[in-house]
């Protein structure tokens, strides 16, 4: 994938990003052979899906970003490749956590912090400016399990599909941006 062709990425270090993406793909391939971390067929599409939010939302003021149910790193890892924010990834699966920790070392990501626990079990030491999650669970239960990480200024950015509108019942302050079948939902 040629990232320099996208206008919304023009202000980022795409050479460094490309190098880290290459490391990511090699490491994922190696881990997937043993641990079956993900069934994704088109990694490039999923990487693009992870960073497309930068076209819709300004992350520049976010100091701490929490990602819930990080799995194989979509979307948080690719945002961490581009942004200076501290990323806190919550993933209880030991195999996925091992992958993320290895990736952190291989890519020299000092802004990546990985927690092998469910977010609701975390004894917080920070409040997140942004909380991200990609298709983990419905919105309302997600908001509830993140109580210990959020305050009145926390913004949720959620990668969702076509069922999003049913999930937004009783949620008042939100925006939705669309790219193909993906719905990026920002809940304030």
Curated annotation (Swiss-Prot):
Function comment: Specifically methylates the N7 position of guanine in position 527 of 16S rRNA.
Protein name listed in UniProt: Ribosomal RNA small subunit methyltransferase G
A GO-annotated cellular component: cytosol
Keyword field: Cytoplasm, Methyltransferase, rRNA processing, S-adenosyl-L-methionine, Transferase
Taxonomic source organism: Campylobacter jejuni subsp. doylei (strain ATCC BAA-1458 / RM4099 / 269.97)
Gene encoding the protein: rsmG
Enzyme class: transferase
Positions of S-adenosyl-L-methionine binding: 69, 74, 119-120, 134
Reaction it catalyzes: guanosine(527) in 16S rRNA + S-adenosyl-L-methionine = N(7)-methylguanosine(527) in 16S rRNA + S-adenosyl-L-homocysteine
Family recorded in the similarity comment: Belongs to the methyltransferase superfamily. RNA methyltransferase RsmG family.
Subcellular location, record wording: Cytoplasm
GO MF annotation terms: rRNA (guanine-N7-)-methyltransferase activity
Principal location listed in the UniProt entry: cytoplasm
Lineage of origin: Bacteria, Pseudomonadati, Campylobacterota, Epsilonproteobacteria, Campylobacterales
E.C. no: 2.1.1.170
Pfam families reported for this sequence: GidB
Coiled coil: none
HAMAP family referenced in this protein's UniProt entry, alphabetically: 16SrRNA_methyltr_G
The keyword Nucleotidyltransferase is annotated on this UniProt entry: no
